[in-house]
Amino acid sequence: SCMKLLPDLDFNLIQRNPKIFAGFSDLSALLNAIYERTGLVTLHSPMITNFSEPSKFMVRSFLNAINGFPQKDLFAGVPVNVYCSGIARGTLKGGNLVTLTALIGTQWEIDTDGSILFLEDVNEKLYEVDRNLTHWILAGKLRKIKGLILGNFRGIKNKEVYRILSQQMEIDFPLVHCPYIGHVQNKITLPVG
């Protein structure tokens, strides 16, 4: 688990020697911690092994990211399902639901106030996703977000994830689903920060 590394990281050293930090899933803990403690933008992106058989979209999205996002419309050509429309401005943060849920209540939990949050997961049962999202709601982590992007929850229909949220809270922010976020072959690269 990447969470075990957090107490031993020298964030001042990382800040003085900026590098591209990229990955997804369990690395969500590191990506968000590095951004929040250094201000360096990290990348929720494919892992090196994902490039063994990459799609053109995945390569294009990753290259756009490492070149500073010259193409500003990150979701161009990506299917997006809109559940609650609107305009959101904020800092993009997020990643793997279970990993980030485990950080809530620790010094490493992400500050979601004013953020556009994205969440994804894989191989979790619906009741587990329900429990984790309920934890976010009860911890107040969704109270002041500006927007929410639901990624791929492989094995669970995105409408079910939306239903979990909408039954427990008033959704007064833009909420969309993007199937290219998470444990999928056509993976979009998103900036954390």
Task: Tell where the protein language model's regions lie, with residue ranges.
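Internal helical hairpin/lid segments
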Residues: 108-160
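Short, well-ordered alpha-helical microsegments
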Residues: 2, 30-31, 101, 126, ...
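ATP/nucleoside-binding phosphotransfer catalytic cores, i.e., glycine-rich phosphate-binding loops
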Residues: 152-193
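Conserved anion/nucleotide-ligand pocket segment
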Residues: 39-101, 105
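Glycine-rich, charge-decorated loop segments at or immediately adjacent to ligand/cofactor-binding or catalytic sites
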Residues: 28-38, 184-192
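Short, acidic/small-residue loops that bind anionic groups at enzyme active sites
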Residues: 9-34, 41-48, 171-176
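Active-site-proximal cofactor/substrate-binding loop regions of enzyme domains
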Residues: 1-11
